[in-house]
UniProtKB/Swiss-Prot annotation:
One of its GO terms (molecular function) is phosphate:acyl-[acyl carrier protein] acyltransferase activity. It catalyses: a fatty acyl-[ACP] + phosphate = an acyl phosphate + holo-[ACP]. The lineage of its organism: Bacteria, Pseudomonadati, Spirochaetota, Spirochaetia, Brachyspirales. This is Phosphate acyltransferase. It comes from the Bacteria. HAMAP family: PlsX. SUPFAM superfamilies: Isocitrate/Isopropylmalate dehydrogenase-like (SSF53659). Pathway: Lipid metabolism; phospholipid metabolism.
């Protein structure tokens, strides 16, 4: 499997990202990498690592869409930007999927313009896995579509169900609609209408509304469906809360000598908690419903995050989730009505 990796974007040094990507090769012998960025810098970075020359290719470009740059402006004026070149490799069938830890808007735009949507998909959503007490659940949309119609939400539910079955290996995933209360009558006009539509879909194990405070419980839900505005807020709140709690505990521990002694023994627990909630642990969010794999990383993606992103790319593509989505949308009656 060939994976195109934009190592020129993001906030971490190129050398760290290259090292992380190459470390994934040691764990999966079926992965080949196409590293996109400045050839001289990439060659220098990989010369410091042990790797199989036959499994790594380099595609040179000096153009980068900066983190604070307008995605539309970058896509228009930088035709050979690293993220565009990586996505183009998927379109041209040289790669099965691409990953970028750079400008999120530019990554989404590159995926849509270069790879394109599956027939029947109205709006590709961003999906990601998140930890809960006894495992994982997935949530979509995480920010690709801020304004969503009921039709979009219904499609997200179908796509999320496919993802949970094939990626998380859950036979009959429970699908919940993110809302401000569990009652059927809760929510705005769009969530109420979405609730009614989802309740009528026999192929979906719809459990009703799910409140944000219930998502992380051990036995609550497997797929959380939301519009991109609410989904992105929930994601960032979870990440921020996890970091806050860990830092708060550390500050409390420092207040007296006895706590310091206990804190030293608890340090592995604190680090494990922080690691589980870190964006590096799940590597990337995935843009579903495309004619190829598109994976969006956090700007702060580290070498560890890059390694996990590459391994998760393989897991997703090997499960042929996008191919299954096209069939499920048609079978469920949630396909796009006008092509």
């Amino acid at each position: 499997m060939n994976l195109a990796i934009d190592v020129a974007s993001g906030e971490k040094p190129l050398e760290e990202l290259v090292s992380g990507a190459i470390s994934a090769l040691q764990e999966n012998k079926d992965i080949n990498l196409i590293l996109v960025g400045n050839e001289k810098n990439i060659s220098k970075a990989i010369s410091k690592t042990k790797y199989d020359h036959n499994r790594i290719d380099i595609r040179h470009t000096d153009e980068i869409i900066d983190m604070n740059e307008s995605p539309a402006n970058g896509i228009k004026h930088k035709k050979n930007a690293s993220v565009l070149l990586a996505a183009r490799l998927v379109r041209e069938k040289e790669a099965d999927g691409f990953f970028s830890p750079g400008n999120t808007g530019a990554t989404l735009a590159a995926a849509l313009t270069e790879i394109g949507r599956l027939k029947g998909v109205m709006r590709p959503p961003l999906i990601s896995t998140l930890p809960k007490l006894n495992g994982e659940f997935c949530m979509l949309d995480m920010g690709a579509n801020v304004d969503c119609t009921t039709d979009y939400i219904v499609q997200f539910a179908v796509m999320g169900r496919v993802f949970a079955k094939r990626y998380l290996k859950i036979d009959n995933p429970r699908v919940g609609l993110l809302n401000i209360g569990e009652e059927d009558s809760k929510g705005n006009a769009n969530t109420k209408k979405s609730f009614e539509r989802l309740q009528k879909m026999k192929k979906i194990n719809f459990i009703g509304n799910i409140e944000p405070n219930d998502m992380l419980k051990s036995d609550s839900v497997d797929v959380v469906v939301a519009d991109g505005f609410d989904g992105n807020i929930v994601l960032k709140t979870i990440e921020g809360t996890a970091s806050f709690v860990v830092n708060l505990l550390k500050e409390e521990v420092k207040k007296n000598p006895v706590s310091v002694m206990g804190g030293l023994m608890m340090k592995p627990v604190f680090n494990n908690l922080k690691s589980k909630m870190s964006s590096d642990s799940y590597g990337s969010a995935i843009l579903l419903g495309l004619n190829g794999g598109a994976f969006v990383g956090h700007g702060k993606t580290s070498g560890v995050g890059m390694k996990n992103a590459v391994l998760n790319m393989y897991k997703f593509l090997d499960a042929k989730i996008n191919e299954k989505i096209a069939k499920e949308l048609y079978d469920s009656g949630a396909k796009r009505r006008i092509f």
